[in-house]
Structures are given as C-alpha cells and as structure tokens.
Swiss-Prot record:
The gene is rps802. Component of the small ribosomal subunit (SSU). Mature yeast ribosomes consist of a small (40S) and a large (60S) subunit. The 40S small subunit contains 1 molecule of ribosomal RNA (18S rRNA) and at least 33 different proteins. The large 60S subunit contains 3 rRNA molecules (25S, 5.8S and 5S rRNA) and at least 46 different proteins. Residues 135-145 have a biased composition (Basic residues). GO terms for molecular function: structural constituent of ribosome. It comes from Schizosaccharomyces pombe (strain 972 / ATCC 24843) (Fission yeast). One of its GO terms (cellular component) is cytosolic small ribosomal subunit. It holds the Pfam family Ribosomal_S8e. Gene3D superfamilies: 3.10.290.70, Ribosomal protein S8e, subdomain. PANTHER family: 40S RIBOSOMAL PROTEIN S8 (PTHR10394). InterPro entries: Ribosomal_eS8, Ribosomal_eS8_CS, Ribosomal_protein_eS8_euk, Ribosomal_Se8/biogenesis_NSA2. This is Small ribosomal subunit protein eS8B.
C-alpha cells in the first residue's frame, strides 16, 4: 500500500466509516518525508507529476541566510537545530525542515559588519583593527557616514560574541534541496528565546 493524500479513508464527522467506492489514484500519491539531517551535502532528484523535478535533500551543512535589518545575505554553515515549533523529536535528531530554528556560524556576517562599518562587532565605537592599517580618506568618510546605522540589538550582539546566531529556515529542504532562511531579530527573536528558555 502506498502513501496517499486522499481523505476518503477518514471517518466522517459523526464517526461513521465511509464506504470504499474507488481505489487509490496516482495523482493522490504521497512520498516518505526526507528527514534532512546536518552533514555533507547529499541531494536526490525526484521525478514528479508533469515531468517536473523535486530535489530531495537528505544531508545539508550550509545555506544562504539573510540579515533583514542590514539587507545582506551570506552563505554560512548550519551548526545545529535549536528549536522546532511542531516537534521536539526533530530537535533531538537535528532534522532540517521549514520553520526550524537553527544555529548558524556568525563569522561571515561579523566579517561583513566590520568591513562595512569599520568597527569591531560588540565594541562600542572602537576601531576595527588592533594594528591600524591606514585607510584612505574616502573609506573613512564612508565609515563615518554609516556609523549612525551601526546599532545592533543587544540579544544579537551576545550571539555574535558566542559566534552563533539563531536563524529560521524559510525554504523547504525536502522539496527544493536548499536550506535558506533569515536571522532572528527583534520581537521574533525574543519570542523564540522565551520558548527555548528552560522551564522552571
């Protein structure tokens, strides 16, 4: 028996069993979940209805994540699954799905921030390098003009100090073969931090 997406096999609202009036159809088929794990990239191509292709990611270790408030995206390493709104089992097994909260490597975003603003991440207005390399006046003007926008949320700053950022997966790894998403910040970050805090 194959996996099917029909509702004829379900009982009615009153609890009555429905009579079977036809067999399963090809257009109702479903497939096993991909259960994408963290590891060296392994993607299977699946031929689907209409001759189209789906890309079933079985293992992924990186993805493109965007930092919304700064308007920048970087490819970065996925470290682990920290929280999942639907199932704790997916956290325990490090399964990547859409809307999973993952920890990603902060290094690419830190490097971008320090070159863009010319200040060290987590240092109140200090210059970027311990051994100052001479910068052209043009670069200095650019950095000083950008300084007003360099404010980072304190919760995000502590994550940068630890080298790991919380992000949400917004793509569907079992369908598109990619694990892309965005960094959590603001109200959304505080909401998930409360959810992940150990219960007393």
């Amino acid at each position: 028996m194959g996996i099917t997406r029909d509702s004829r096999h379900k009982r009615s609202a009153t609890g009555a069993k429905r009579a079977q009036y036809r067999k399963k159809r090809k257009f109702e088929l479903g497939r096993q979940p991909s259960n994408t794990r963290i590891g060296p990239k392994r993607i299977h191509e699946v031929r689907v209805r209409g001759g189209n292709k789906k890309f079933r990611a079985l293992r992924l270790d990186s993805g493109n994540f965007s930092w919304g408030s700064e308007g920048v995206s970087k490819k970065t390493r996925i470290i682990q699954v920290a929280y999942h709104p639907s199932n704790n089992e997916l956290v325990r097994t490090n399964t990547l799905t859409k809307s999973a909260i993952v920890q990603i490597d902060a290094a690419p975003f830190r490097v971008w921030y320090e070159t863009h603003y010319g200040i060290l991440m987590g240092s109140k207005g200090k210059k970027a390098t311990a051994t100052p390399t001479p910068k052209s006046k043009h670069v200095q003007r650019k950095h000083s003009a950008r300084l007003g926008d360099s404010k980072v949320d304190s919760a995000l700053e502590t994550q940068f100090a630890a080298g790991r950022l919380y992000a949400v997966v917004s793509s569907r790894p079992g369908q598109s073969g990619r694990c892309d998403g965005y960094i959590l910040e603001g109200e959304e970050l505080h909401f998930y931090l409360r959810r992940m805090a150990p219960k007393k």
